[in-house]
Amino acid sequence: FTPLVLGITQALRRNPIPYLIGLATAANIGSVATITGNPQNMIIGVASGIPYLRFAGYLTPVAVLGMAAAWAILVVVYRREFADRALPSDGNGPVEFHRPLLVKGLVATGVMVAGLAAGAPIPLAALLAAALLLITRRVEPQRVFGEVDWSLLVFFSGLFMVTGALEKTGATARLFAVARPLAEAGGASLAAVGVVLSNLVSNVPAVLLFRPLVPQFANPQAAWLTLAMSTTLAGNLTLLGSVANLIMAEMARERGVYVSFGEYLKAGVPITLATLAIGVAWLGVVG
């Protein structure tokens, strides 16, 4: 969606930064709602055995309320941008889209969600949807490979190497040993530890560190849900906090729009704090 946002804001002569930050933070907040929303949620879904619909029932309200909070914060932080309500005409005609591809994508998504709702294993449901898309594709492999952002893949390869090195040297284990007493307290303490670890070693390694510990908690389900919520929303704290943030920043940079680390913090920090407060409060009531 980054090219789409840039195209619209440039056509309307608006500052693209607030909309790009809104796009990235919304992607992170929205992904908290389901097991398939992001990689760490999938790990938690497999490890915890929480049914797909139950997981969504607990965390979808966090995503909805979090979206509302993020919108309000962006409007306040960039009030000058949103105070000007006069929008010029973009001069474009009707929007064109590839209807068969849209239908195929919706059907594949529906098959996956139906399988997950019926209790099918997460990997099997995802592979079934992917297989449906593969056997009906018409795009040549060369074109697909040409659209891959190889520089971003190299960046993530390096990031995972650094994370792996920290684990091999025992640095993450020592850090987790210090944080473990707080994590075992559950609730806000567990969420805080999840946020800190997610921004130090990334959210997926943080969840993997917690995986052997959570079954020992007094209420493992509540702990898993708190961990899913906190490690996901932690991605909004900094520009480097999530894959969505990095993809947005990289694609914007390629098109001449630079989202700086400091600029992102202006909205990222309050959005993270507000959504975490919502998540902790909600799970404290329903968990």
Which role fits each region the language model picked out?
Residues 23-34, 92-103, 151-166, 270-276:
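Small-residue-rich segments of transmembrane alpha-helices in multi-pass membrane proteins
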Residues 1-5, 35-41, 122-124, 200-210, ...:
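Transmembrane helix boundary and interhelical junction motifs in multipass membrane proteins
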Residues 67-140:
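Long, contiguous bundles of hydrophobic transmembrane helices that form the permeation core
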Residues 108-222:
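Transmembrane helical segments that form the transport core of multi-pass membrane transport proteins
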Residues 11-17, 21, 33, 53-97, ...:
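Juxtamembrane and boundary regions of transmembrane helices in multi-pass small-molecule transporters
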Residues 41-54, 87, 169-181, 215-216, ...:
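Membrane-interface helix termini and inter-helical loops of multi-pass transporters
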Residues 24-36, 115-119, 192-206, 229-240:
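Transmembrane alpha-helix interface/packing and boundary motifs in multi-pass membrane proteins
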Residues 1-32, 43, 207-229, 259:
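Hydrophobic transmembrane alpha-helices that form the pore/transport pathway of multi-pass ion
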